[in-house]
Design a protein with these regions (language model features):
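Non-transmembrane, aqueous-exposed alpha-helical and coiled segments at domain scale
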Residues: 2-391
Length: 391
């Protein structure tokens, strides 16, 4: 897509601008040894790759180690929401009912709802699942972003103008705003996607309202697809993904961003927009997009996708910075806390296999499985240091 002229520097000034770039890089350079000398963390991971403790929370707990005879050892990862093992929450939802709504209730209020409480909560969310035609036209359809995360930020920030009491940060008002965002963000995400596809790829534009009788996962799928159709398995898998991404210990980049921004006393919409900005980054939520791009690149450069040696050669080139985006990162591999396994990956992998079987895409699933197996081996033995790595 051609850059808008109002965002471009005159060609005649390019050389001078490049000189300024060099000066800027020199001016901002810090000797890397100083970080170790003054024990300054360069982000939310320590120099050894482990997560940095940034606060305390009882909402969720993430563990990747166990202590045996006073010695800390790698262990299979565990994720708890308000004391509940997330595997049990997702398992109940997959087999019996959709779990995202009751998980949201659990995270907000500290306990699982009974049937009556869940029905009331469903009713509140359903009553808020609406975006005015003016909002959709003026905010989402005009100047749609090539990256959906920017569209989400813009939309969330603009909701401030539609709120009669946006700056009140009392618990009751922030809860009201939070429920509004929980209800409206699925619509905002889907509508931004449709606008993106329409204006950048000339797809037909189909905007559908949410249906109050459906779960969040079902509504996303029926609004996303022109024919509104989806299979029960697709809805269950998406519901599981929503549950597993609902919370993660309070120390990840976007949640930490929210802590920092809200500490200034700013409004809910500004804080959430800042968190979305953080989530967009390729070393946080944006890594999902990088995984897709990396696999597309792998398809182009590996002739036999069932050959372990060719896959390993490609991944080694990625780690050297000679392939893909030259970052030296295998996206989707490694975690600041988890060691032997990531419980979210274990659960989603099981449902991904079921989905692949139903779609006739087991070869593609096997490729992802192969990259996971080979990639973890390469990363675990990188620099001749054996370190547990989870996908």
């Amino acid at each position: 897509m051609k850059t808008n002229s109002m965002m471009s520097i005159d060609d005649a000034l390019d050389a001078k601008f490049n000189e300024l770039v060099v000066s800027c890089m020199k001016s901002g350079a810090i000797d890397l040894n100083l970080y170790q000398e003054y024990d300054v963390k360069r982000g939310l991971r320590d120099s050894n790759g482990k997560g940095v403790l940034t606060g305390l929370t009882e909402i969720s707990d993430v563990t990747g180690y166990r202590v045996v005879d006073g010695v800390k050892e790698p262990a299979d990862g565990m994720l708890y929401y308000q004391g509940y093992d997330v595997k049990n929450l997702v398992g109940d939802g997959i087999e019996k009912r959709f779990a995202f709504e009751e998980t949201t209730y659990l995270l907000l209020f500290g306990y699982l709802p009974n049937k009556e409480q869940l029905e009331v909560f469903h009713g509140i969310i359903a009553s808020l699942q609406e975006l005015s035609g003016q909002f959709v036209r003026d905010v989402i359809m005009k100047a749609p972003s090539a990256n959906l995360m920017n569209g989400l930020q813009k939309s969330v920030l603009t909701l401030y103008s539609y709120d009669a009491n946006p700056d009140d940060i009392s618990v009751s008002n922030v809860l009201r705003q939070s429920l509004q965002l929980i209800a409206k963000l699925p619509l905002i995400a889907v509508y931004n996607y449709h606008a993106y596809r329409h204006f950048h790829f000339f797809d037909s534009l189909v905007i559908k309202p949410a249906k109050p009788e459906l779960s969040t996962a079902e509504n996303i799928l029926q609004m996303l697809r022109p024919n509104g159709k989806y299979t029960p398995l697709e809805a269950r898998v998406l519901d599981a993904a929503l549950v597993l991404h609902a919370e993660h210990g309070g120390g990840n980049n976007s949640t930490f961003t929210n802590h920092v921004v809200t500490s200034s006393g700013t409004d809910t919409y500004s804080a959430v927009a800042a968190s979305i900005a953080s989530l967009k980054g390729p070393r946080h939520g944006g890594a999902n997009l990088k995984v897709q791009q990396m696999f597309a690149d792998l398809h182009e450069h590996v002739t036999d996708l069932e050959d372990d040696d060719q896959i390993q050669e490609y991944l080694q080139a990625v780690l050297r910075g000679d392939a893909f985006d030259h970052s030296g990162l295998i996206y989707g591999m490694g975690h600041a806390v988890y060691t032997l396994s990531d419980p979210r990956e274990v659960i989603l992998k099981d449902y991904a296999q079921k989905l692949a079987e139903s779609k006739g895409m087991l070869k593609e699933y096997s490729l992802y499985d192969r990259v996971e197996r080979i990639g973890t081996q390469l990363l675990s033995h990188r620099n001749h240091v054996v370190k547990p790595i989870s996908a």
